[in-house]
Each structure stands twice: as structure tokens, then as C-alpha cells.
Amino acid sequence: MIADKLFEKVEKNGVVCVGLDTSLDYIPEEFKSKFSNESDMLFAFNKEIIDATLDVSACFKVQIAYYEALGLKGLEAYKNTLSYLREKNALIIADIKRGDIAATAKMYAKAHFEGDFESDFITLNPYMGMDSIDPYLPYIEKNEKGVFVLVRTSNKGAEDIEYLEAGHGKKVYDVVGEKLNTLGKNYLGKHGYSSIGGVVGCTHQEEAKEMRDKLDTMPFLIPGYGAQGGTAKDVAAYLKNGNGGIVNSSRKILLAYKAMEDNKNFAECARKEAISMRDSIREAILK
């Protein structure tokens, strides 16, 4: 199961998930000047970041919107980035947040679990119901693939829907998490985690222990670290024995060179930030 590969990557490299949410204005001007087109520029920047952080991260999350916004040349950079990650045997999360059902969802599954855009995991939105997850299950069962489904997110607007009362003392996010955790038990790996994971923001620490205990076999994709205010202490509460999830950081890693005032060595700065993040979380876990 792909869940086992993720667990083992975390054991080896730590919990950091490097977010390749690469906006053109994140790229240093002097690096940009080497390229005549945006596709090559984006891919080359990503490649530098990947090479610098590969051995200090569990996986890479590539947010497709940053590439779609540039049209075909952006999608070419997206394709090339995924291809390079596969070449490096890195685990890939395609952050696509699809949420349709039936035949449309089958096409999304085919698009992102096969071919040019093949990834190991994708993100999904469960708002239309559990039948929006069903078309991805054959890939989970037979093709070593996995999904991370939105459960309780880190944005302020999450309270508009995810926190609504659903009866019996539960909120909407509780019900979503429980349904996914139950389904996920059909796809458990040898380390006790499922290939059906949940996106759980780390900006609500007061709920962390309860969620970790209830969603016992669900690996968490944890956004909100760094730029959104989440700390190492916040993150540690969502993990179990230092595993059971990965922690995404995009801007804080990609833009580390600005904080370190070293545009020329942006990739090395990204590596330093990833190591610092990994070590801070490890220290918080031990406390």
C-alpha cells in the first residue's frame, strides 16, 4: 500500500512535505533572467528545490492551480515537475481538490493517477458525498495510489461549513472524518495506516488530540504551518509517535532565501528551512 511507503519515508526523512506552490514572483529575478519562457523557468526552479530537499522531506505537494494559471506552458512545467519527482523516486501529492462524482470523477482519477500527470496521492473535496470518493478506490486497491480528503481545514472560512452542528454533539468535520476513517480501514497498510488520508489543518490545536485518537488509522496531510501561523507545537499534537502524517510548508520553504537574504543560493536556503522545520517538529514531539 502507498500508505506504507509514506510511513517509511517519514521514518527515514521526517514529516516535512515540501509544497511546490510555485508562483512566478517567488523566483529570484537573477534566476529568471536565464530563461526565455515561463515553462522552463518554473521547472528549473522546482528542480533546484527538489534536489536540495529530497533527502530531508517525506514528499512533495504540487498545487496544480499555480500551473493551470499559466495555461499550456504552466501545465508543461507541472508535467515535467511530476516526471522529475517520479524519476527521483519521490512521493508526490497532486493538490487538485477534485470533488465531482460518477463518470467525471473517473476521468479525474484517470487523469491524475495515470499518464502525464500521474501522482501517488491526490487531494479531494468530499462535499458531494462519499460517492465522490468511490471512483478513486480501484486505484487505491490495485494501483498503489492514495487520497487525502478535506476534513478540517486551516482557513478561517472553515467555520462556515465544517463547524456546523450535525447532531448528536458532532460537527460536520467530525462526521466527514469518521466516515472516511471507517472507509479507510479497508485499505490499511502493514504499519496500521490507510491509503485514505485526511487534510487536517494545524491551526486548531485544541481539537488535535481528539481527532488523532478518533481517526486512528488516517494519515494526516497537515497544512497551516509557518505562513498560516501553525507552529511545531501545534503540529506535534496531530502526530503519533512522530508519524501518522506529513506537514506541508510552501511559501516558508520556497521563499526562505528572502528571509536569509541570499537570492543566489535559494535552493540551499530552502534546504536549511526544511531541516529547521523538521528538527523543530521533532523537538516538539519529544517534549
Curated annotation (Swiss-Prot):
InterPro entries: Aldolase_TIM, OMPdecase_AS, OMPdecase_type-2, OMPdeCOase_dom, RibuloseP-bd_barrel. It comes from the Bacteria. Keywords: Decarboxylase, Lyase, Pyrimidine biosynthesis. The active site is at 97 (proton donor). Its EC number is 4.1.1.23. Pfam families: OMPdecase. SUPFAM superfamilies: Ribulose-phoshate binding barrel. SMART domains: OMPdecase (SM00934). It catalyses: orotidine 5'-phosphate + H(+) = UMP + CO2. Pathway: Pyrimidine metabolism; UMP biosynthesis via de novo pathway; UMP from orotate: step 2/2. One of its GO terms (molecular function) is orotidine-5'-phosphate decarboxylase activity. One of its GO terms (biological process) is 'de novo' UMP biosynthetic process. Belongs to the OMP decarboxylase family. Type 2 subfamily. PANTHER family: OROTIDINE 5'-PHOSPHATE DECARBOXYLASE. This is Orotidine 5'-phosphate decarboxylase.
